[in-house]
């Protein structure tokens, strides 16, 4: 009979050193790695995502990297299914599992769970598509039906408005009542140790600036040109930091040096949001610098 595997999560802002630390931890713990990164999940988005190279991945099986094409949709439900598949694989391989990345919302959903959504009929899909033609009007209408639920949703958030419309059109029940009837179930039900990298803000800004420079030297602009030509600007991933600024540069909006500055500034802002989210959403987290966490992780191996 397969024994329960050991799992841990490693979180921290972008450019904080998660990738290298996760690989060291996986080597010490005899573990697979599951990436929770909203860009590394895509094939062909290599430079701008700063995903681990093939060389870095040698010897450690990585999941959640190069998983889908840039024009394919990916959401938290898909990620949970991915985690479940990876967990089964890790158990079968008699490996532990290190979960690592900057998109900590996915980790939160693994721990808290999401409610199962109803199967959406073609009729409902058509009604929802029609309603989404006027996002503001749909938001206002849903707010009259379910003010408590909709006050947490921006009028410019098409994904969550679409979900609310689907639920109401399909079930005739407002989202609040639906989620009461179908509460979320955590996917990870056992205790999950979470290790959070803490980095000085100025040091992190320097790391981000250096990484941006390396991306440009490694061919960032050529990569974005290829992605635009192959997939257009329509996919959601084409709005990611590093991609949207490069597209603006290609449009002649600013010069190359300004491109580096724009990416650096926007990435630093993202890092601040990630840090704020991590501090507010997870309890009993083991915090420390990369070297401090490395010592803790390797001693506990």
Curated annotation (Swiss-Prot):
Originating organism: Sulfurovum sp. (strain NBC37-1)
Enzyme Commission number(s): 2.5.1.75
Quaternary data: Monomer.
Role, per record: Catalyzes the transfer of a dimethylallyl group onto the adenine at position 37 in tRNAs that read codons beginning with uridine, leading to the formation of N6-(dimethylallyl)adenosine (i(6)A).
Reactions accelerated catalytically: adenosine(37) in tRNA + dimethylallyl diphosphate = N(6)-dimethylallyladenosine(37) in tRNA + diphosphate
Keywords: ATP-binding, Magnesium, Nucleotide-binding, Transferase, tRNA processing
Sequence positions that bind substrate: 14-19
Region feature Interaction with substrate tRNA, mapped onto this chain: 37-40
Cofactor(s) recorded in Swiss-Prot or TrEMBL: Mg(2+)
Record site feature (Interaction with substrate tRNA), residues: 103, 126
PANTHER family per UniProt: TRNA DIMETHYLALLYLTRANSFERASE (PTHR11088:SF60)
Homology family: Belongs to the IPP transferase family.
Listed name of the protein: tRNA dimethylallyltransferase
NCBIfam families: miaA (TIGR00174)
Domain of life: Bacteria
Encoding gene (name): miaA
